[in-house]
Regions:
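Membrane-proximal C-terminal cap and juxtamembrane stalk of leucine-rich repeat ectodomains
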Residues: 3, 10-24, 28, 34-39, ...
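LRR N-terminal entry segment and analogous cap-like coil->beta motifs
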Residues: 35-84, 88-91
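Conserved hydrophobic beta-strand positions in leucine-rich repeat
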Residues: 40, 59-63, 82-87, 106-111, ...
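Consensus "Asn ladder" position of solenoid repeat domains
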Residues: 45, 66, 90, 114, ...
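The feature encodes a structural signal of leucine-rich repeats
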Residues: 47-52, 71-74, 96-98, 120-122, ...
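Leucine-rich repeat
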Residues: 48, 54-57, 69, 77-81, 92-93, 101-105, 117, 125-130, ...
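Repeat-solenoid scaffold signature
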Residues: 157-189
Length: 256
């Protein structure tokens, strides 16, 4: 075998090794796995910031179970091919306005189990491709702006369960034309005018509630688990088991 052919075979073997999935070579960040050319899995790596070396053409980015406190405002501008982003169970306290834009291709975004405190107007930048948004299990999330989801015309599933919401303006939901599923259970709702409007909207749109929340209370035809957190005086005929929200898991910060 000629030296030229031998060298060619060696070079080809080396290239195939570097391109193999999950080895951290090529365009894959050193601390992550890349099971296919457009997926980067950096879950549970103890990361305190976004890893370096994420390929620009990544489409599926898994960053769950780390300690990441923030996402740069231009992150999704840089990674414009991204369609699936999982950031659940980190230490995010806010999402910068403009992180998503009308040009974003993101379809799935999971920000559950973080330390978010509010969802402000413009947070999601009228991203018209977003279909599923998970914001549940943020124990400090107590405020959602009426126009927080404005422009999310393709959003079908919205999860806001087990947060610290005592009120939610009905406009936050009513201006989502494609909404098919909304989760609100496990919040400490206060029975006031805002809640009455929200509850009336949910009664008119009960097909958008999860199946396990559509059960009536004592024949009143109201979704039982949605009332978790209401004081019994504000919700007559509600059993005491629904009078308090289940405890939230406290999201700890890494030790020094």
């Amino acid at each position: 075998m000629s030296p030229c052919v031998c060298w060619l075979q060696l070079t080809l073997a080396l290239l195939l090794t570097l391109a193999a999935p999950g080895r951290g070579g090529g365009n894959c960040p050193a601390t992550c796995l890349c099971p296919d050319p457009h997926t980067v899995d950096c879950s549970a790596r103890g990361l305190t910031r976004l890893p370096e070396g994420i390929p620009l053409d990544v489409r599926r980015l898994l960053l769950s179970d780390n300690w990441i406190p923030r996402i740069p405002a231009d992150f999704l501008v840089l990674y414009s091919d991204l369609v699936y982003l999982d950031l659940r169970n980190n230490t995010l306290s806010r999402v910068e306005a403009g992180t998503l834009s009308t040009a974003s291709r993101l379809v799935f975004l999971d920000l559950g189990s973080n330390n978010l405190t509010e969802i402000a107007q413009g947070t999601f930048g009228e991203s018209r491709s977003l279909i599923k948004l998970r914001l549940g299990n943020n124990p400090y999330l107590s405020a959602v702006d009426e126009d927080a989801f404005l422009g999310l015309t393709s959003l079908r599933e919205l999860e806001l369960e087990r947060n610290a919401l005592s009120t939610l303006h009905v406009g936050a939901l009513s201006q989502l034309p494609s909404l098919r599923l909304v989760r609100l259970e496990g919040n400490p709702w206060v029975c006031n005018c805002n809640f009455a409007s929200l509850f009336a909207w949910l009664m008119d749109n009960r097909q958008k509630l999860p199946n396990d929340i559509k059960q009536p209370i004592r024949g009143q035809g109201t979704p039982a688990r949605l009332l978790i957190g209401l004081p019994s005086s504000g919700a007559p005929d509600v059993d005491s088991e629904w009078a308090a929200a289940p405890p939230h898991r406290r999201h700890l910060t890494p030790k020094d």
